């Protein structure tokens, strides 16, 4: 009986998914025929962008520095704060329960907001400029790194930690000496990955006055100077390439155990490895201190106690009429539109990313082909999601369909990278054995590779869906549907009651997605 029931669970799940996908696509007005009929607009735009104005190159180096400065300072500061407070969120470490609940509530609230919304809020506190952007990146990094770190701590071997506690050691020093060495490689790897993400986020914070290259990028797109837009995107692509290959090197160093042994003071570490590890740490410290010293100070000239009081009063007293409204401009409809945009965009991106991942690794294709597709994926990832929105809106017009196209392309870049990492980590033995038996590569992949990577693929898709929910919430800024436009308009008009209702809706939405993801 149980076997018969289990046999129907998978087909039923796929049918349910297809029904949800169709309903979400219909709700967002997806029209492939419209996109195909107007694809010439996209090709003309792409042709202009792919002929960059190289004479404009020197003028964007300083804004790019500010973008990198915000990314470095925010990532390092947020990660350091996360490392300090994350043990309080781990259930297995038995810190005070009130501290764990308070920390998890704070992280849940902060994770609900994309970096762009945090940056806009920061401009009301610290004025325009890179300090507001750095503060937003710090909060964004702190929220994500804290969650990842206390989850890693919960899965770590806590026997050494418990032994130190039983010997009278305090909990935090016990965490430093017993748990941190085990989770440090994952912590550093997550920080490197988040740094790359933060570079893309920092490149659009100028849209809300938080400094960086985003203000110039928006200006050139608005003026239709697409040759200069191509120059900016080319520079961002080169930056992402440098970060990508640097991350690969540092990840290899981390996984080799050099950094962990250096922190633990292991005498087994060779002199050459010790010097190399110290040089890497010294380089990171120097870069961080330089970026911190070059940070522009906050501008409190437009910040007053009365303004902060009005902001706090409005955010804590949401507009309940708007919150419960079922009209097309009400919160419920806008949140539903945001969910549908994320569902369709993530699904399309995942469907296209799976075959691209196989073409992106040398395990399944020749090295030159893998290198070519790797460059394409990095180019896709180097463009901020709002830029895709501004490009697609000239093809499909304003509306939710533009948001779907934007998130689909963004999902391709990130999911292909995640899927490729999964493929490179599998055991190739079964696949090679089937090939040696004369089996065609396609069925060999289906029977030997897909069973190994299916859980990791599903986790990556769910993670990307969680990210897309937040990114879809700001796509309205460029007319791509969702809750973003009403939220940003409410904040710019100091309508804090309405902004409070929208922010509360976002918190509940992300919280609900987290609950569903945890039960996968």
Please tell me what each predicted stretch does:
Residues 1-72, 76, 243-347, 359, ...:
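N-terminal, non-cleaved signal-anchor transmembrane helix
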Residues 23-33, 119-126, 196, 290-299, ...:
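A structural signal for multi-pass alpha-helical bundles of membrane permease subunits
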Residues 35, 47, 92, 96, ...:
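Transmembrane alpha-helices and adjacent helix-loop boundaries
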Residues 61-69, 103-110, 196, 332-340, ...:
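Alpha-helical membrane-interface segments at transmembrane helix boundaries
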Residues 73-107, 344-377:
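Transmembrane-helix boundary motif in ABC transporter permease subunits
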Residues 107-141, 377-408:
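Generic hydrophobic transmembrane alpha-helix motif, especially the helices
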Residues 128-194, 201, 245, 398-449, ...:
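Membrane-cytosol interface at the C-terminal ends of specific transmembrane alpha-helices
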Residues 213-250, 483-519:
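Hydrophobic alpha-helical transmembrane segments of polytopic membrane proteins
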């Amino acid at each position: 009986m149980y076997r018969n029931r289990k046999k129907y669970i998978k087909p039923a799940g796929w049918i349910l998914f297809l029904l949800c996908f169709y309903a979400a696509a219909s709700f967002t007005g997806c029209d492939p025929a419209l996109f195909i009929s107007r694809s010439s607009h996209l090709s003309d735009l792409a042709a202009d962008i792919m002929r960059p104005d190289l004479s404009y190159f020197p003028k964007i180096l300083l804004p790019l520095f500010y973008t990198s400065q915000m990314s470095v300072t925010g990532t390092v500061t947020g990660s350091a704060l996360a490392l300090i407070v994350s043990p309080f969120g781990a259930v297995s470490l038995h810190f005070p329960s009130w501290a764990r609940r308070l920390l998890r509530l704070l992280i849940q609230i902060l994770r609900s907001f994309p970096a762009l919304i945090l940056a806009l809020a920061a401009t009301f506190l610290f004025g325009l400029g890179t300090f507001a952007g750095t503060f937003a990146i710090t909060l964004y990094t702190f929220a994500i790194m804290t969650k990842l770190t206390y989850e890693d701590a919960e899965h770590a071997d806590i026997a050494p930690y418990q032994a130190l506690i039983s010997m009278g050691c305090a909990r935090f020093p016990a965490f430093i000496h017993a748990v941190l060495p085990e989770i440090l490689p994952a912590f550093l790897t997550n920080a490197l990955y988040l740094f790359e993400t933060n570079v893309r986020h920092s490149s659009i914070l100028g849209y809300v006055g938080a400094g960086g290259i985003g203000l110039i990028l928006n200006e050139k797109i608005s003026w239709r100077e697409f040759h200069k837009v191509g120059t900016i995107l080319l520079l961002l692509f080169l930056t992402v390439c440098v970060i990508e290959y640097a991350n690969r090197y540092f990840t290899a160093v981390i996984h080799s155990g050099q950094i962990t042994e250096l922190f633990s003071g292991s005498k087994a570490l060779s002199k050459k490895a010790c010097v190399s590890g110290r040089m890497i740490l010294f380089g990171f410290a120097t870069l961080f201190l330089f970026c911190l010293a070059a940070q522009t100070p906050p501008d409190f000239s437009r910040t007053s106690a009365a303004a902060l009081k009005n902001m706090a009063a409005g955010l804590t007293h949401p507009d309940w009429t708007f919150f419960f409204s079922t009209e097309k401009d009400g919160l419920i409809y806008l949140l539903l539109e945001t969910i549908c945009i994320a569902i369709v965009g993530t699904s399309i991106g995942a469907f296209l990313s799976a075959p691209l991942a196989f073409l992106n690794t040398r395990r399944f294709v020749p090295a030159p082909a893998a290198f070519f597709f790797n460059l394409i994926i990095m180019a896709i990832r180097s463009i901020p999601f709002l830029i895709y929105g501004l490009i697609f809106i000239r093809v499909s017009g304003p509306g939710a369909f533009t948001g779907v196209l934007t998130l689909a392309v963004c999902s391709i870049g990130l999911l292909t990278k995640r899927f490729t990492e999964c493929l490179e980590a599998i055991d190739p033995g079964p696949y090679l054995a089937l090939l040696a038996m004369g089996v065609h590569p396609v069925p060999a992949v289906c029977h030997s590779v897909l069973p190994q990577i299916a859980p990791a693929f599903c986790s990556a898709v769910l993670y990307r869906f969680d990210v897309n929910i937040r990114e879809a919430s700001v796509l309205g800024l460029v007319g791509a549907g969702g809750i973003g436009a009403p939220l940003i308009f409410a904040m710019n008009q100091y309508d804090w009651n309405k902004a409070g209702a929208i922010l509360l809706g976002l918190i509940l939405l992300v919280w609900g997605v987290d609950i569903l993801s945890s039960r996968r």
